[in-house]
Design a protein with these regions (language model features):
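Conserved, mostly hydrophobic/aromatic
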Residues: 39, 62, 94, 164, ...
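Short coil-to-beta-strand transition motifs
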Residues: 259, 321-328
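Generic N-terminal amphipathic, Lys/Arg-enriched alpha-helix
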Residues: 14-34
Length: 459
């Protein structure tokens, strides 16, 4: 059965033939570049953290949409391969990898994390059939969506696992705990579970508003709020079920999922110690009622300016050197006295389609010029909020305007290649059909392309 998108990805073989062995200085712009040494480190750090804390792990693959990076997120070994997707095309394209893991004896599961609609029933039913029992999880936040859950069961004769999405303050999706709708939803799911139409597997939250964090303490507080919202909801589930019903309580956005690593670090801040103590107490209460804690996150392998601005970890663990994604562009023109107070400006070959039009709360621009291929410029220890060098201040469809408000950065030249740290990696990568892979740990060969990863396209 073919699960590939009707929008075909570029041929891996042709991409490798075209790019591998070339230097970043010799490829067309704009292009998106990933440093595999940073990807590996970020993925390893997350896996080691959740394993040390004895938490479950679910890797979100919506940011990159590739098989290669999914492998790094899941890791080796016999443990379960649980993933989250935001689109059906991600689920369809990752089925072969999960079947490979399944053949090795690993448990596999895909969580389709958008509240279920009737339009995806047929395609998700095929995914469920391919993976078999316990292979697919569905997200719901309204009782009416259970008709689609039942339709998938009818088509496959496999009861899908179900997560109830909880709105714990982000107001993007999810049912609000303690509301009548939440009570109706819990009761309806339990009824279908008793009829073996589905299996209530867990409660899920996404603290998207945790991107407003500006310290470890703030990110930890959002994480605690996630746990508390799910624990409160579980208490109602337990009451309605009238029996012990162990569930998976799945929390995370990259700021909160990163922040949980602070539990393994030494802290000198009394405020942070108090927050860690409160968080540990909440996690302990979850274990006491027999529930499993699961962590999920997506953009953490790449990171970006939005993530640096959260300061969810100490600076030695979350810094400029952690960011694995850059956008490769070329200087097209120079306008020396055009900026504010006669500051210089430059035109680059990357606009909103190449960078995304995503803001970062720490500074007013749309991307920051990395030090690559430039004379030395000292990056601040503070993150984007302290940066005063070349940055993308204005963008249109294909034009990006670099400004140097501090007039303290190196000069640029027409034809010079530059690499930009984007504000939001998920959006910046979406305009490209593939990633150029380099390994900056290869001394003397940092700019050599060693692989190309094709992205899945469409929905």
């Amino acid at each position: 059965m073919d699960f590939t998108s009707l929008i075909p990805s570029a041929s891996k073989e042709e991409l490798v033939k075209e790019y591998v062995g070339k230097s970043l200085h010799d490829v067309p712009c704009p292009a998106v570049v990933l440093d595999i040494s940073k990807l590996r480190k970020n993925c390893t750090d997350m896996l080691e953290t959740v394993n040390s804390l004895k938490c479950g792990w679910r890797a979100h693959i919506k940011t990159h949409k590739t098989t290669e990076l999914t492998r790094l997120q899941i890791g080796d070994g016999p443990g379960p391969a649980n993933i989250v997707v935001s689109t059906v095309v991600e689920a369809e394209n990752i089925v072969p990898l999960l079947l490979e893991y399944k053949s090795e004896g690993r448990a596999v599961n895909i969580l389709y994390s958008f509240p279920l609609t009737s339009g995806v029933v047929d395609r998700l039913s095929k995914v469920s059939t391919a993976l078999g029992p316990n292979g697919i999880s569905l997200m719901i936040d309204h009782p009416s969506q259970l008709r689609s859950v039942a339709a998938i069961h009818e088509k496959t004769n496999i009861p899908p696992l179900v997560f109830i999405k909880i709105d714990m303050g982000g107001h993007r999706a999810g049912v609000i705990p303690g509301t009548e709708t939440c009570s109706q939803l819990i009761s309806s799911v339990i009824t279908l579970t008793k009829r073996n139409v589905c299996i209530l597997h867990g409660l899920y939250s996404h603290a998207g508003h945790s991107y407003s964090s500006n310290s470890q303490t703030a990110a930890l507080d959002y994480l605690r709020q996630e746990f508390e919202a799910l624990l409160i909801t579980y208490e109602e589930v337990h009451s309605v079920a009238a029996t012990k019903l162990p569930l998976v309580l799945s929390v995370g956005a990259t700021p909160t999922s990163s922040a949980i690593r602070n539990l393994l670090l030494s802290s000198t801040s009394s405020e942070e110690l108090n927050e860690i103590s409160a968080l540990k107490a909440t996690m302990g209460a979850i274990h006491d009622v027999g529930c499993e804690i699961e962590i999920h996150a997506g953009v953490y392998p790449m990171l970006d300016m939005q993530q640096l601005a959260t300061h969810a970890l100490p600076e030695d663990l979350l810094s400029w050197s952690s960011v694995a994604i850059t956008i490769l562009a070329e200087i097209a023109s120079l306008y020396p006295p055009r900026g504010t107070s006669d500051s210089p400006e430059a035109l680059i070959t990357a606009g909103s389609l190449a960078l995304g039009r995503e803001p970062c709360k720490a500074y007013p621009g749309w991307g920051i010029l990395s030090p690559w291929n430039r004379t030395s410029f000292a990056l601040p220890n503070t993150g984007p909020e302290g940066y005063s060098g070349w940055q993308i201040s204005r963008i249109s469809q294909e034009h990006g305007i670099l400004t140097n408000p501090g007039k303290n950065d190196s000069e640029l030249s027409i034809g010079q290649k530059v690499r930009i740290w984007p504000n939001h990696a998920c959006i910046a990568g979406a305009g490209y059909g593939w990633y150029l892979i380099v390994d900056e740990s290869r001394t003397g060969k940092e700019d050599e392309i060693i692989d190309v990863w094709a992205r899945w396209r469409g929905w």
